[in-house]
Amino acid sequence: MRGADVMQEELFTIGGLDQYVPVDHPLRRVREVFNDCLARMDNHFEALYSAFGRESIPPEKLLRALMLQVLFGIRSERQLIEQLRYNMLYRWFVGVPLHEQPWDHSTVSKNRERLLEGGTPEVLFEQVLDG
């Protein structure tokens, strides 16, 4: 008997994005090193953000997304967000679970400007060299 060509969504997703990324994938090591650098930048990030108001995109996630943009030659933030919508490898690297929608590209632009004005690229570069 021929099976039907239908796609049934699961009610619950078991496991996380990590299970879809091969153990030997090169981005695993990149993410590990990058996360170590970002962890050492916590005081820098705290100084850039107010304790009040709406939560913004976590700077660590934004920087991981921008790292993907550079590594894979993604030409615009609009394309970056499009990739984050359906690319599980990118979602895993950035830390965006399947049940969350990626941010709007204009929000990414505004938050990127905050990081640039706050000297984040220089601090990140220092952390990479010190790593």
Placement of each model-derived feature along the sequence:
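Short amphipathic alpha-helical surface patches that mediate protein-protein
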Residues: N35, R85-Y86, L129-D130
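Short acidic (Asp/Glu) and glycine-rich catalytic loops that position anionic groups and cofactors
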Residues: Q8-T13, M41-F45, H105-V108
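Active-site- or DNA-interface-adjacent structural scaffold in DNA-acting proteins
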Residues: Y90, V96-G131
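Charged, often Cys/His-bearing segments associated with DNA-binding zinc-finger transcription factors
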Residues: M1-D36
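Short, conserved catalytic/metal-binding motifs centered on acidic residues
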Residues: H25, L63-A65, L80, D104-V108
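DNA-recognition alpha helix
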Residues: Q79-R91
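Basic, short loop/linker segments at the boundary and entry of helix-turn-helix/winged-helix-like folds
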Residues: V23-M67, F72-G73
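Short, charged, surface-exposed loops that flank catalytic or proteolytic processing sites
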Residues: S76-E77, T120
